[in-house]
Amino acid sequence: MNISLTKTQKTLIQSSGDIARIMRQILLRENRMSRQREHVWTIGLNDEFKMLYVELIAFGIPAKDKVQPMEIYRLPLQKDAKYLYICHNRKTNDMSAMSDDKALTDRMIQVGNIVGIKVFDHIIINSKTEDYLSYHDIGLMDELRKSLKWVPKFEQAEKIKQMAVQEALKKDRIAIAKTLKKNKTDIKVIMQATGLTAEDIAKLK
């Protein structure tokens, strides 16, 4: 689920604290009960380190078990993101890096290597306080980038590459459809030219 951002939140990210602050603001939009449940988000940044989007990729307990790294990269590929942040909340005061958190980050790094998007950090925010942990700040991201544990097998790597190609082609089709729509081209012609559905075309601005 794509999360709406305010103009002030679509800003230049200069530190892990910037991400933690914005994600805490997003978490606080929810009611008290929902805040205590685990959320996993990804944050896409452009090459100038400005936020492009925030996406909620999993919610509930255990949220991280629902995460499929290959699927997560569809939106950053569509948005042309260059950097990806992972963020999740924790309701306990233990802000240490757990083994399942590190495994998720490791897997995301390996898929990112294939599609050309760098996983820059994994940030854990506290649901009740302003405490947070940044893997980048404590040097854990450098350690995980050296890991070979989750390097995809050849067949998996080829599927991931194919997904990246398909998303790039889709982005081109969307650009063409936007131009045709702007020129008031008949929607049936746009559908034939791009392969997009009428519903997809209607959403384009």
What are these regions, as identified by a protein language model?
Residues 153-171, 192:
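A cross-taxonomic marker for long C-terminal extensions/tails that follow the last structured domain
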Residues 73-83, 164-183:
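Surface-exposed, interaction-prone regions with an acidic/low-complexity signature
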Residues 92-96:
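Short, solvent-exposed loop/turn segments at secondary-structure junctions
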Residues 170-205:
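Elongated, amphipathic alpha-helical interaction scaffolds
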Residues 90, 124-126, 194:
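Conserved beta-strand edge residues that scaffold enzyme active sites
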Residues 83-91:
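Glycine- and acidic-rich phosphate- and metal-coordinating loops
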Residues 1-79, 100-111, 115-118, 128-155, ...:
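N-terminal beta-strand/alpha-helix entry module and adjacent surface
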Residues 121:
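Beta-strand-loop-alpha "switch" segments that mediate conformational coupling across diverse proteins
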